Amino acid sequence: MKTKESRFHIHDELTAPEGSLPILKGALSTGGQLSNFLGVLAGSPAVLRAYARFRSELRHGELPLKSQQRIALAVAQHQGSEYWLNTLQRSAREAGLGLDEIALAREFDSRDHAEMVLLRYAKALVTTPGAAPPMHLHEEAREAGWTDEQILETVAHVSLSLFSTLVTRSGDVPRDG
């Protein structure tokens, strides 16, 4: 059976450019397996470093992990990224989201009012490129209890998710495992 091949080379610690090795070794040191996505990014040390730094900084932000997962699921669904939908289904469950919330998040929705409002804001970012989200969505997010810091992090998570889906789609990156 022929397996799907990526348009980009999927590197590991033996084939990656030297500038990518510190990040790859760090990822492998956690005992996990290197994802195909990181293997592709390793082809450009600058891109891998930028992604790793951006993601690392956002992990230390104020946006709850469940919110981050919901945003990533919604963007992956909107962008049609099977790679990320497969990966995020697992990580969302590990973050404590139930199957019902995962399904809702994929549609920019949630049973939790505050999360639903934030996802509507994220949806406006994704579906109206070149335009600011309507002011009422920004105001609704604030009224739902989201701070400016969390709203800015939402914008950042949307951009990180868009970048991730663009890489996997443009490279036709096969699912892990």
Language-model-detected regions and their locations in the chain:
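Hydrophobic alpha-helical segments
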Residues: M1-G177
